[in-house]
Amino acid sequence: MRIHVFNPEHDLALASNLDNFTAPHAGRELRHDLGFLPALWAGEGEGVLVEDRSAAEYAFGKLGLPLKGSFVTPDELPQLVSDPSFSLQPWGWDRAVRGEFLRLGAPAQGLPDDSYLNFVRQTSHRSWAAEHLLRPLRKVQGTVGEAETGRTLSEVRRFLSVRHHIVLKAPWSSSGRGVRYVSDGTDGAASTFGFTPQLQGWVEHVINRQGAILMEPYYNKVMDFGMEWHCDGKGNVRYCGLSLFKTLKGAYTGNLLADEEEKREKMGQYLNLSILDDVKQKIQELLLTSISNVYCGYLGVDMMIVNTGDSLCVHPCVEMNLRMTMGWVALHLHEISTKPWSDMRISFKNGRYGLELGMKQ
């Protein structure tokens, strides 16, 4: 039996690199409340791990979609993992989710080994995408983007003195929590974004814990978007589609649900679509030569349209998420839906996270 697991703490688990990792409270809440999500794609005879079966059935039932798989709870897992047909499909692979199932009695031979998990972790480091994707993608005409790795506080200060308004990112972080905006004031940005003692402490903490910090110029963003992909681990890469999404303070809030042509039409209002096609082709080439023979699963490359003052350009790799993404969920929802949904949103109401679907007017 294949068991699906929504582990949104994945990015933080990569940072810890521990077999026994306890996520922060917000991450545990997200997993508890949205644990039903894999039921959207789980097939017949497959299970979806949730902490509260009744809550999961209620949340999924509100979507009005047929449930093909079944919800399973932690107390049922020891029996399920002993079945010879057991396999695990998490949101993202890390030592913590493997350790969780090893402690439940899952056979080690059915789970990824250290070599694979180390590959996922190192390739998920923001500096990997900056070096292996962003740098070669910048050769595509109509693109913009720069990212450097800082390993000392003085390197961060030096980058700020040159760029004046910058974005600092922890190498492994999730949904905006590891991102800080900084200005030295010379560009007219609010002084509240200055290099305060609190920010200095955060920078030193990130460097001490993760070994480095990513430094980028601040860009005047017009639109967030991404491209979703799948690698089969055998040298093949498949393009899944465009993801048009929204963020608030760097944290994901929702996705447009539409077919590819409608999304391209929206983006065509801002730029020449040939730029998108060139970026797409280049990413496929880069993924083929770098990870396609090892990584098996979905991944997303986040991008944005940027106003440089002179023109609108594409930042072709803000980050790469080597895991399932909400962008892929949106693509899948649009594919399976028979209803005129317009968008998908992650909400937080009455102390609980939820998935909301908006209808076209």
Protein language model regions, located:
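Glycine-rich phosphate-binding loop of ATP-grasp-fold ATP-dependent ligases
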Residues: 147, 165-199, 225-226, 250-267
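C-terminal amphipathic "assembly/sorting" segment characterized by alternating charged
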Residues: 44-50, 341-361
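Short, glycine/acidic-enriched loop or turn micro-motifs at the edges of active sites
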Residues: 172, 305, 322
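A long amphipathic alpha-helix within ATP-dependent nucleotide-binding catalytic cores
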Residues: 208-212, 216-220, 239, 251-312, ...
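Phosphate-binding site of ATP-dependent enzymes
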Residues: 164, 195-253, 305-317
